[in-house]
Design a protein with these regions (language model features):
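Buried hydrophobic core positions in alpha-solenoid tandem helical repeats
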Residues: 22-24, 62-64, 103-105
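Detector for intrinsically disordered, low-structure N-terminal pre-sequences
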Residues: 1, 9, 59, 63-66, ...
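Alpha-solenoid helical repeat architecture
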Residues: 27-30, 67-70, 108-111
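Alpha-helical solenoid repeat architecture
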Residues: 1-7, 25, 36-48, 76-89, ...
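Short, hydrophobic/charged alpha-helical patches characteristic of ARM/HEAT alpha-solenoid repeats
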Residues: 10-17, 33-35, 50-58, 73-75, ...
């Protein structure tokens, strides 16, 4: 699914056939390897605006949780997914409300180079959200 999700038609077929809830469930409750692959698939699926909106509507909590406490690879994939979700303006509030800003900020401070790069990119996108601007100002 990870590689297939790069094709827009296949990505839409995955979403329309009910593939998103099981991927979010795996991101939340799967084995370490399943969490990485689920986050990677969701990251690639989130390039499509319609799918990104659906993922955000289903809940970004599992992705934020992976950024906070997943394996090294899961953290990077989940951070990338949050960044892709944030490309859709209306998703930014959901990410902020789920603790995404704090989780990504922590990853920038404590992650490896790849994690830091992905988290910084996601934060740059999130910085355009009023909700995040309020958090930054409050410190």
């Amino acid at each position: 699914l990870v590689n297939m999700a790069f094709d827009d038609q296949v990505a839409l077929a995955i979403a329309q056939s009910g593939g998103l809830p099981p991927l979010l469930a795996l991101a939340r409750e799967g084995t370490a390897g399943q969490k990485v692959r689920a986050a990677a698939a969701l990251r690639n699926l989130a390039y499509t605006e319609q799918i990104a909106s659906e993922i955000a509507a289903l809940g970004v909590g599992p992705l934020v949780a992976l950024v906070k406490s997943g394996s090294a690879h899961a953290k990077e994939q989940a951070a990338g997914c949050l960044g892709n979700l944030a490309l859709v303006t209306r998703n930014r509030s959901a990410i902020q409300m789920a603790g995404g800003y704090e989780a990504l900020s922590q990853l920038v401070m404590e992650g490896n180079q790849g994690q830091r790069d992905v988290a910084q990119s996601a934060l740059k996108i999130l910085a355009h959200a009023d909700e995040v601007a309020c958090v930054v100002v409050k410190g």
